[in-house]
């Protein structure tokens, strides 16, 4: 079974006047999202939450530019079960992650559980890593994209047989 997830990139200004701020249901902000990127596998916070946190840390130099960040996110996270949607409610998924942009020195990520209609977390990348990181083979975004790391793993497997 797959834990489906969607990642949105939204400027933090769209949360400032809402009573729940970054903890609100992100489907209400779909008109303000720079991207709605669906990933079919491993959407739980211990994987995708940490992946996004690691990715933000590796790309801190572009965190102030929402559109550039959204484009690079798709490039770096792409694999064969990655799709883009106009609206987040067009695809069934459990977790919606929002990367809140606008201040490169104060980045936040929220995780909303669509199945239970509740916010799981609103944390900085460092706090996500501290809380959720496990002994898993996360992508090293300083050196690879998700796809290039997978290709390198396949090449290694082929060469060992």
Residue ranges of each PLM-predicted region?
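Short, flexible N-terminal segments of the mature chain
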Residues: 16-68
């Amino acid at each position: 079974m797959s834990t489906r997830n969607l990642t949105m990139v939204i400027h933090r200004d769209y949360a400032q006047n809402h009573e729940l701020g970054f903890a609100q249901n992100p489907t209400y902000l779909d008109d303000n999202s720079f991207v709605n990127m669906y990933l079919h596998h491993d959407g739980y916070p211990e994987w995708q939450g940490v992946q996004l946190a690691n990715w933000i840390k590796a790309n801190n130099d572009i965190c102030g530019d929402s559109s550039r960040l959204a484009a690079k996110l798709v490039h770096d996270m792409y694999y064969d079960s990655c799709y883009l949607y106009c609206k987040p409610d067009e695809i069934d998924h459990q977790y919606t992650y929002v990367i809140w942009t606008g201040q490169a020195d104060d980045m936040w990520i929220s995780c909303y559980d669509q199945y239970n209609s509740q916010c799981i977390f609103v944390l900085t990348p460092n706090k996500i890593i501290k809380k959720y990181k496990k002994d898993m083979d996360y992508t090293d975004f300083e050196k690879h994209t998700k796809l290039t790391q997978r290709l390198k793993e396949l090449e290694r497997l082929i060469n060992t047989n």
